[in-house]
C-alpha cells in the first residue's frame, strides 16, 4: 500500500507477537522505533511511562493487521491534528527509523490540511522539517504535485466521485446566496485535486489516514461518509478498526469509541 523500502526486522507479524509477552514486545518495538530502551525507570515520571509504553508498544501494536510503518504514520497524523509538536518531532524520527520515507511522512501530514486547516499543518511541518534537518534530509523535498490549474477539478472529481458520489454537491445546494456550489467545488479542487492526487501515498492509504484525523476531531457525519469511502478504496472494516485503535492511546478512549461504534454499526446501505 505504501511507497516504501524494506522494513527492519522487528516484531510485527501476528505469529511472532502472539508468542511474546507485552513487556518483551514493548521493548523490541520501542528499540526499533526510538533506538533506546523502554521501561528503564528513568525520568521524572517513570510510572506513567511504564504504563503507556507497555500499553502502546506491547499491546496496541499487536492489535489488528497493520505494519509498523502504517502505525507510525497514523501516530504522526494524530499528533499533527492535536498540535502535539514535540511528540510529533520525536515520532518523525521513529517513523524514519522503521522505513517511512520523508516523502510519505510529509504527504501524510499534508493530507490533514483540508480537515484541520492550513495553520495547523504549517505548525506540524515545522516540527517534521526540524527532525528531517537533524537527520541530514534536505528540505524542501521533491514536489509530488500531479495536477495543473486547468485539470485540478477534473482530476479531483475522478477520485472523489467513485468514493463519495455527489453527496457534497447535494448537501450544499441550499446554502444561502448560491454559495454552496462554490463550497462543493472547493472541496473537489482542494481536498481531492490538490491533495488526493499527489504522489507519495496512494488513495487507499490517504483514506485510512483521513479517517484517523476525523476520529481525532470527532467529526461524526464525516466519519460515516469516510468509512464508506475507505471500504470502496480497498480498506476492510477490520483494517479501519485497527487504525482507530492505533489512535486510541493518543486521543483517549471516548473519541476512539465514537469511531469504533460507527464502524461496528455500519451497514452497506448507510
What does each model-found stretch correspond to?
Residues 198-199, 212-217:
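Short, glycine/charged-rich beta-strand-loop motifs at protein surfaces that mediate ligand recognition
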Residues 1-13:
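Bacterial Sec-dependent N-terminal signal peptides
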Residues 20, 24, 46, 85, ...:
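Electropositive phosphate-/nucleotide-binding environments in soluble metabolic enzymes
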Residues 80, 98, 111-118, 215, ...:
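A short structural micro-motif
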Residues 67, 83-106, 119-132, 218-242, ...:
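Extended intrinsically disordered, low-complexity coil regions enriched in Ser, Thr, Gly, Ala
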Residues 12-68, 121-203, 232, 249, ...:
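Acidic, glycine/proline-rich low-complexity segments that act as flexible tails and inter-domain linkers
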Amino acid at each position: 500500500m505504501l511507497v516504501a523500502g524494506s522494513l527492519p526486522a522487528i516484531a510485527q507479524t501476528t505469529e511472532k507477537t502472539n508468542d511474546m509477552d507485552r513487556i518483551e514486545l514493548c521493548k523490541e518495538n520501542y528499540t526499533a522505533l526510538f533506538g533506546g530502551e523502554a521501561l528503564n525507570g528513568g525520568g521524572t515520571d517513570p510510572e506513567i511511562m511504564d504504563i503507556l509504553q507497555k500499553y502502546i508498544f506491547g499491546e496496541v501494536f499487536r492489535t489488528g493487521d497493520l505494519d509498523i510503518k502504517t502505525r507510525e504514520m497514523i501516530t504522526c497524523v494524530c499528533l499533527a491534528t492535536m498540535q502535539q509538536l514535540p511528540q510529533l518531532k520525536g515520532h518523525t524520527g521513529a517513523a524514519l527509523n522503521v522505513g517511512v520515507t520523508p516523502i510519505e511522512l510529509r504527504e501524510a501530514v499534508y493530507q490533514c490540511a483540508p480537515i484541520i486547516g492550513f495553520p495547523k499543518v504549517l505548525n506540524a511541518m515545522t516540527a517534521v522539517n526540524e527532525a528531517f534537518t537533524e537527520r541530514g534530509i534536505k528540505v524542501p523535498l521533491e514536489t509530488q504535485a500531479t495536477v495543473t490549474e486547468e485539470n485540478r477539478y477534473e482530476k479531483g472529481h475522478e477520485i472523489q466521485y467513485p468514493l463519495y458520489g455527489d453527496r457534497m454537491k447535494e448537501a450544499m445546494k441550499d446554502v444561502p446566496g448560491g454559495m454552496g456550489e462554490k463550497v462543493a467545488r472547493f472541496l473537489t479542487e482542494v481536498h481531492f485535486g490538490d491533495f488526493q492526487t499527489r504522489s507519495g501515498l496512494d488513495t487507499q492509504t490517504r483514506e485510512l489516514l483521513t479517517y484517523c484525523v476525523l476520529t481525532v476531531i470527532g467529526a461524526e457525519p464525516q466519519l460515516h461518509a469516510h468509512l464508506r469511502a475507505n471500504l470502496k478504496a480497498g480498506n476492510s472494516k477490520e483494517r479501519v478498526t485497527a487504525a482507530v485503535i492505533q489512535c486510541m492511546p493518543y486521543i483517549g478512549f471516548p473519541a476512539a469509541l465514537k469511531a469504533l461504534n460507527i464502524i461496528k454499526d455500519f451497514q452497506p446501505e448507510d
